[in-house]
Amino acid sequence: APGGEWRPAAGRPLAQWPDGSVRWLLVSFGAREAGTHRLVVNPDTVPTQPEVRLTQVDGRWIIDSDRLHMVVCEAGPGILGELVCDGVPRLEHPGDLCLSVDDASTRYEQKRTVQVIESSPLRVRLRVSGQLVEADGTCRLHYRLGIEIWAGWPAVRLDCHYFNLQRGVL
C-alpha cells in the first residue's frame, strides 16, 4: 500500500501456458487507501487471519468467515438457506431472499447449479445458475447470480444477470 501497510492478496489463474504454468493471474486484495500499490511475492507467507472458508455438504455450499455465515442451496425454496452476520440471523426462512420478475420467482425453482469461481482464504466467489419459475412450473427467465464474500468484511456482494433463453417467448 502507498502508506507501507502490507495487505493480503489472493490469486486466481485466468489462463495457462501449454506447460501448465500461469500465463494470466487475477490478483485480489482489499485496498484501504488510494494510490499506487506494489505486488510482492513471498512464498513463505502464511494465510492471513481472518479467513473465509467454503465447504460443500449434501447440496449445500457453506461459507464461513469471522463476520458472516451463509449457506447457498442447490435445491429448495430459497437460494440462501441461512445468512448470519455478526451472530445475528438475517433470514427467517430460506425463501425470504428470492429473485422475482412479475409472477416468476426462484421460490418455485426446484433445482439450481452452484459453481465455485474462486475459493481462497481471502475471498470466496460462487456463481448460482437457475430459473425464474411461475407457480404452475412455467419457466420465464434464466438467471446467473454472483455471490462474493471477503474475509473480515460484514458484507455480501450479489450481482444478478437475467437471460431469456426461450426461443419466441418474451
Model-derived features: where do they sit?
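Extended, charge-enriched "interface" segments that sit outside catalytic cores
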Residues: S105-Q115
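Aromatic-lined carbohydrate-binding surfaces of glycoside hydrolases
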Residues: L97-L99, Y108-E109, L132, F163
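Alpha-mannosidase-like glycoside hydrolase catalytic domains involved in N-glycan trimming
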Residues: A1-I62, D66, C73-G78, E82-L91, ...
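Acidic, contiguous internal or C-terminal segments within carbohydrate-active enzymes
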Residues: V71-E74, V116-L170
